[in-house]
């Protein structure tokens, strides 16, 4: 870091070529020495917790001087043997497992002497690049931050089956001499191949590299070819559900959670509360595996070491040091790291880094919190999973920060490997084709750290976890400030004030409540009022008694409503008074509604059930408020004329008077509705008028249109004798309209008996003469066709069993003879020569 002292003893070790052995790392000099400027004064020793004074650089984890190797478990003064579980007293470093004096051999669990082996990402913002055969020189970022003592060692030789050695220590051959079939991408070579560009010499370079890196460069990153070309050796953060299929039998258990919520922001700090920094470089989609690198926000090194057995079980070590940056609204960030210290219980340490003070040292959240973020694992399916730490300590796994996990499967198990992912996901992430267990959902409002795996399908969480980040409601503070005692206990205590608007009918109530009479409520419900006729014939409406309780309407109604009797008296008083001396601001006076128009309005309200028409009537009655524009429009057009226009009624006072008189004459037809009464009135007046008069012709036309439906056929059939008489006395024009009306009736079997009576048949037959118009004859023919179809369908027998067909049969025979004679007469008229010869 800037301003830190130079540690001369820190040097980076170059990577060996393929086919060579790695000799003792400390004795070799690097071609380009890497100057490390750590702030740490005390040298980390074996078995001691590192004391760090490293400044926190943005988007970087704190750095300790103790360096570890990626993908290797810590060892304590012991050689690494294949399949042996290590016991360690090593100190942990951010982003790596604790290391002791051991050197790393290719693909095996290694011992290191505080050296960073390829696969361990430096904790500073600048990652060191160890020099490789590609000519990649160790670089550091321009900021001049310190680098770790990285020694780039190849994990395995590519051109020979020899094992990379470190300090002369041997290792299990089974871990290195891997059959080439396990690695389809190694081009038939034995050993563990890193991912490099095509045609390059396959050497595993350092996994420590700086952030500014071109995509064209070879990706010598952590990851190896898995048993399947189509499977990836690590998890790619692409916003999708993570799937790692590096297990030969595709039987793996997944315990992974990430906080990314499908939001990956490469090389940038997440702005959401639960985002992770991800920069994943993937090669071509056609390749079997994709190289990956997680940058400053999240330093993740995944190491899979395949081992070939009879069942091709893989000992995979998924190593992850990640950092979740949680930003609250105060721009505070919590950094969690996975440092496991020897001989201690599990505890959680979080680095709080404030935006204003980036140099805050690492602080402990809990010194010896045994219950904080502890995960205990028991053997499942003849295998044990190391969770949350890099060593075994009396089968108790310590997790510090919850960011480290190891996936291990014993050689003889049939379950494959239980994969522990190094990132957290709120949704299920799968390693392999089959997930043994499902990730437990956790609350969105509280981040619980330290448990990625489950013991017997039960999540082991601390009862009192150390709160890292909790979502707080933005509006909760304002709501909590309200005093509960001041809140109303009942609705009676609630007072709502409404501001009067221009149009209360749009859903706003008036400024003052009012009570509306019962008769007005009947209008609202579109029910006809009970009209009581006086001896003089005038209608009297039942009025609301003062002592009777009336329903209360608290919305949309104006308090100036008056009863019908009050309105009538008011309008009569206005008519009797002089117009010059009369001054009133009521709605009836404003709309200029007279007494006669008001009575017509009452009749229309009784007859019409249209709610829109009722709204207009309510405005005129004073029951509903309206804007000034609406009132002016109703006044200029007239309320009755407006309603009649909307109903397509004739906009004339004569028609309104006719309807009013018809209603007053309703007692002769007490069981008929308004339209039926009107039809009966029209039939009587039509037959009463003089023959061929204009009034009679108008009535017949109206009845012709009313008979388009069968609703009123029975009523009109009662006047059949009168209409048949018109066929003998009226002119051709009147006959045409009468026959049109009877043609409509002929389609109804219910009136066929009256229509085709003996008298009717004789009249119809009498129309077949040379003097009758062709149109009238054609209508009569259609009528006989209709009755013939009714008889053939059997509908006539269902309606009337007593209906006799004898008159119809005789009429049909006579009709045929008349038709032939008529046709001959027509032919003679069209051909004069034939007529003269005959």
Swiss-Prot record:
SUPFAM superfamilies: ARM repeat (SSF48371). The modification Phosphoserine is found at residues 282, 284. One of its GO terms (molecular function) is G protein-coupled receptor binding. Residues 1-121, 218-293, 531-552 are annotated as: Disordered. InterPro entries: ARM-like, ARM-rpt_dom, ARM-type_fold, GASP1-3. One of its GO terms (cellular component) is cytosol. GO terms for biological process: hematopoietic stem cell homeostasis. Keywords: Phosphoprotein. Transmembrane segments: none annotated. Residues 13-31 have a biased composition (Basic and acidic residues). It comes from the Eukaryota. Residues 255-271 have a biased composition (Basic residues). Residues 220-235, 542-552 have a biased composition (Polar residues). Interacts with cytoplasmic tails of a variety of G protein-coupled receptors such as muscarinic acetylcholine receptor M1/CHRM1 and calcitonin receptor/CALCR. May play a role in regulation of a variety of G-protein coupled receptors. Belongs to the GPRASP family. This is G-protein coupled receptor-associated sorting protein 2. The gene is GPRASP2.
């Amino acid at each position: 870091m800037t301003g830190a002292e130079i540690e001369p003893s820190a040097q980076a070790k170059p990577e060996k070529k393929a086919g060579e052995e790695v000799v003792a790392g400390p004795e070799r000099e690097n071609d380009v020495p890497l100057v490390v400027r750590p702030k740490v004064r005390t040298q980390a020793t074996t078995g001691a917790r590192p004391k760090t004074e490293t400044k926190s650089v943005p988007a970087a984890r704190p750095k300790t001087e103790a360096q570890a190797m990626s993908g290797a478990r810590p060892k304590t003064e012991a050689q690494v043997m294949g399949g042996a579980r290590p016991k360690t007293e090593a100190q942990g470093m951010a982003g790596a497992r604790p290391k002791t004096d051991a050197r790393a051999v290719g693909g095996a669990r290694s011992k290191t002497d505080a050296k960073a082996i390829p696969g361990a990402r430096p904790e500073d913002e600048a990652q060191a690049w160890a020099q490789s055969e590609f000519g990649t020189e160790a670089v550091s970022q321009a900021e001049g931050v310190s680098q770790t003592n990285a020694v780039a060692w190849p994990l395995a030789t590519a051109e020979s089956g020899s094992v990379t050695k470190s300090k002369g220590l041997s290792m299990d051959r089974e871990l290195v001499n891997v059959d080439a079939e396990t690695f389809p991408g190694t081009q038939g070579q034995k050993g563990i191949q890193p991912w490099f560009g095509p045609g390059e010499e396959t050497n595993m370079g350092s996994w420590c590299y700086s952030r500014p890196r071109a995509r064209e460069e070879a990706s010598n990153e952590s990851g190896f070819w898995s048993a399947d070309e189509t499977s990836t050796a690590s998890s790619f953060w692409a916003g999708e559900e993570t799937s790692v299929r590096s297990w030969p039998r595709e039987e793996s258990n997944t315990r992974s959670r990430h906080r990314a919520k499908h939001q990956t922001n490469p090389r940038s700090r997440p702005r959401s509360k639960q985002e992770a920094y991800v920069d994943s470089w993937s090669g071509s989609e056609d390749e079997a595996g994709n190289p990956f690198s997680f940058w400053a926000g999240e330093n993740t090194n995944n190491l899979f070491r395949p081992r070939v057995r009879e069942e091709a079980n893989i000992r995979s070590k998924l190593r992850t040091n990640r950092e979740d940056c949680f930003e609250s609204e105060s721009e505070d960030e919590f950094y969690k790291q996975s440092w496991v210290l020897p001989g201690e219980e599990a505890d959680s340490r979080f680095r709080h880094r404030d935006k204003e003070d980036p140099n805050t040292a690492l602080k402990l959240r809990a010194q010896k919190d045994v219950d904080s973020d502890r995960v205990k694992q028991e053997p499942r399916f003849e295998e044990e999973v190391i969770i949350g730490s890099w060593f075994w300590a009396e089968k108790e796994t310590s997790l510090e920060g919850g960011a480290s996990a190891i996936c291990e499967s014993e050689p003889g198990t049939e379950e494959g490997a239980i994969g522990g992912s190094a990132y957290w996901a709120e949704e299920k992430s799968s390693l392999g084709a089959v997930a043994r267990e499902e990730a437990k959902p956790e609350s969105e409002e509280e981040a619980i750290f330290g448990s990625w795996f489950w013991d017997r399908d039960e999540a082991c969480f601390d009862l009192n976890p150390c709160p890292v980040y909790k979502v707080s409601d933005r509006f909760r503070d304002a709501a909590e400030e309200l005093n509960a005692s001041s809140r109303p206990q009942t609705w009676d205590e609630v007072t709502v004030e409404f501001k009067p608007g221009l149009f209360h009918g749009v859903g706003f109530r008036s400024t003052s409540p009012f009570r509306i009479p019962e008769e007005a409520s009947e209008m609202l419900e579109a029910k006809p009022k009970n009209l009581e006729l006086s001896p003089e014939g005038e209608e009297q409406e039942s009025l609301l008694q003062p002592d009777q309780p009336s329903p209360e309407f608290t919305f949309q109604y104006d308090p100036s409503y008056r009863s019908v009797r009050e309105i009538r008296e008011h309008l009569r008083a206005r008519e009797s008074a002089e117009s010059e001396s009369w001054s009133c601001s009521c709605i009836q006076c404003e709309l200029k509604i007279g007494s006669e128009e008001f009575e017509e309005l009452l009749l229309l309200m009784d007859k019409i059930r249209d709610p829109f028409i009722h709204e207009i009537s309510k405005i005129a009655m004073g029951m509903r408020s309206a804007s000034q524009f609406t009132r002016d429009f109703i006044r200029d057009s007239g309320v009755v004329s407006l309603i009649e226009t909307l109903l397509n009624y004739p906009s004339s006072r004569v028609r309104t008077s006719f309807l009013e008189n018809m209603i007053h004459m309703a007692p002769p037809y007490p069981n008929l509705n308004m339209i039926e009464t009107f039809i009966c009135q029209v039939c009587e007046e039509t037959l009463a008028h003089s023959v061929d008069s204009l009034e009679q012709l108008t009535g017949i036309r109206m009845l012709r249109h009313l008979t388009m439906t069968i609703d009123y056929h029975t009523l009109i059939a009662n006047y059949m004798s009168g209409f048949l008489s018109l066929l003998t006395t009226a002119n051709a024009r009147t006959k045409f309209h009468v026959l049109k009306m009877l043609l409509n009736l002929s389609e109804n079997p219910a009136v066929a008996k009256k229509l085709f009576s003996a008298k009717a048949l004789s009249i119809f037959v009498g129309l077949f003469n040379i003097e009758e118009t062709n149109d009238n004859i054609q209508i009569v023919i259609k009528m006989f066709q209709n009755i013939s179809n009714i008889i053939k369908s059997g509908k006539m027998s269902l309606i009337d069993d007593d209906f006799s067909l004898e008159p119809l049969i005789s009429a049909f025979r006579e009709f045929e003879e008349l038709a032939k004679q008529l046709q001959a007469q027509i032919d003679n008229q069209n051909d004069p020569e034939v007529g003269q010869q005959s």
